[in-house]
């Protein structure tokens, strides 16, 4: 996977956390920049670790399904992207954007884990594509840190407008990446 595909994947994966951080930023009366950085770091570190875990799980199984690697990656991205799109169209009952005044470390870690489960599944798919997982995980973590920090700072202004649309956009990006992987592996790319 080249750098532009890695960046697209990373920012696509960060949309879940971005949507959650907009909600968090909207809940806090006046989020400080250091709160946004702290939240971004927590989300970024967790989002970087989970694809490594998924990759390790997928790597051990890769010898059994190498012939189907592109189908596995495509299916995972399609399911995850589709789920993000569906959740983006759901009503405001989404627990990740819940208006909770508590900005504790435990709450942030729980939210970060909840939004990073997709990254673990992506890690499984990446094991079949034989990518540099450390590089990819670092890019995913950095992209998530940037997007969460931005989401926190602008959340109180655009939370009601963009919160769910960000998740839909992220889901569509993942579906597009899955289609591109399938397209390339079926021999249509030059």
Swiss-Prot record:
Keyword Membrane in the entry? The reply is yes
Q: Check the record and name the InterPro entries matching this protein.
A: Mntp/YtaF, Put_MntP
Q: Tell me the classification of the organism that encodes this protein.
A: Bacteria, Pseudomonadati, Pseudomonadota, Gammaproteobacteria, Enterobacterales
**Organism whose genome encodes this protein:** Pectobacterium carotovorum subsp. carotovorum (strain PC1)
Give the Gene Ontology MF terms in alphabetical order: manganese ion transmembrane transporter activity
Protein name as it appears in the record: Putative manganese efflux pump MntP
State the family named in the UniProt similarity comment for this chain.
Belongs to the MntP (TC 9.B.29) family.
* One GO CC term, this protein: plasma membrane
Residue ranges of the TM segments? 3-23, 41-61, 62-82, 105-127, 143-163, 168-188
Cellular compartment(s) = Cell inner membrane
| Purpose of the protein | Probably functions as a manganese efflux pump.
Which of UniProt's keywords are assigned here? Answer: Cell inner membrane, Cell membrane, Ion transport, Manganese, Membrane, Transmembrane, Transmembrane helix, Transport
Q: Which residues form a coiled coil?
A: none
Q: How does it sit in the membrane?
A: Multi-pass membrane protein
């Amino acid at each position: 996977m080249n750098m532009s595909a890695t960046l697209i994947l990373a920012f696509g994966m960060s949309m879940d956390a971005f949507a959650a951080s907009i909600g968090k930023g909207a809940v806090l009366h006046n989020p400080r920049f250091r709160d946004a950085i702290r939240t971004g770091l927590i989300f970024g570190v967790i989002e970087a670790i989970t694809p490594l875990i998924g990759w390790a799980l997928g790597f051990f199984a890769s010898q059994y399904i190498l012939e189907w690697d592109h189908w596995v990656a495509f299916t995972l991205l399609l399911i995850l992207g589709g789920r993000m799109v569906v959740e983006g169209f759901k009503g405001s009952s989404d627990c990740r954007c819940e208006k909770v005044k508590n900005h504790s470390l435990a709450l942030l870690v729980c939210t970060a884990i909840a939004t990073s489960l997709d990254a673990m599944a992506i890690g499984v798919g990446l094991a079949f594509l034989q990518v540099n997982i450390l590089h990819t995980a670092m890019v995913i973590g950095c992209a998530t840190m940037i997007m969460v920090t931005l989401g926190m700072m602008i959340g109180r202004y655009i939370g009601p407008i963009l919160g769910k649309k960000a998740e839909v956009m992220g889901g569509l990006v993942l579906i597009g990446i899955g289609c591109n992987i399938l397209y390339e592996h079926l021999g249509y790319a030059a």
